[in-house]
């Protein structure tokens, strides 16, 4: 985990008011600038006006982090919802996504597949069980969390 991400995550997590929760912090290059994305959510989803209110809370807090982890040339701040197709990075993200349609990219092939899409049937903290459609029948594929390179929820059409 990037130092800026860890510092920001640890610093702002206790300041996120209920019923909201800190979903993820991202620190990435955006054009010629660096962007700090604070992804927040709540049961039932978050509204755009709520992200604006949270931005008003979070922005001044970031200015009080000492020592300052941000580059002297500044950064862009985005406070947003993780969205309908949200990233799954931590064990608690997978636990919260049980029953949802997901996309998983693997470090190495499992069942001759490096990318798997299906319904997340269960997650025990270490292994995902994904129900995939193989031609005309369903089958469950077990995926160790350590084998997951990238994952996200998907909108099923």
UniProtKB/Swiss-Prot annotation:
GO terms for biological process: ribosomal small subunit assembly; translation. The keyword Cell cycle does not apply. Disulfide bonds: none annotated. Belongs to the RimP family. HAMAP family: RimP. Required for maturation of 30S ribosomal subunits. This is Ribosome maturation factor RimP. It comes from Lactococcus lactis subsp. lactis (strain IL1403) (Streptococcus lactis).
């Amino acid at each position: 985990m990037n130092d800026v991400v860890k510092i920001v995550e640890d610093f702002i997590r206790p300041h996120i008011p209920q019923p909201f929760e800190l979903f993820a912090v991202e620190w990435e290059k955006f054009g010629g600038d660096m962007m700090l994305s604070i992804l927040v959510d709540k049961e039932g989803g978050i509204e755009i006006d709520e992200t604006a209110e949270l931005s008003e809370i979070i922005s001044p807090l970031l200015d009080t982090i000492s020592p300052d982890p941000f580059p002297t040339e500044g950064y862009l701040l985005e406070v947003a919802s993780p969205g309908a197709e949200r990233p799954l990075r931590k064990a608690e993200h997978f636990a919260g996504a049980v029953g949802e349609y997901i996309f998983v990219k693997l470090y190495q092939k499992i069942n001759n597949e490096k990318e798997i899409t299906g319904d997340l049937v269960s997650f025990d903290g270490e292994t995902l069980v994904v129900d995939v459609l193989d031609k005309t029948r369903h089958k469950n594929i077990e995926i160790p969390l350590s084998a997951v390179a990238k994952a996200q929820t998907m909108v099923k059409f």
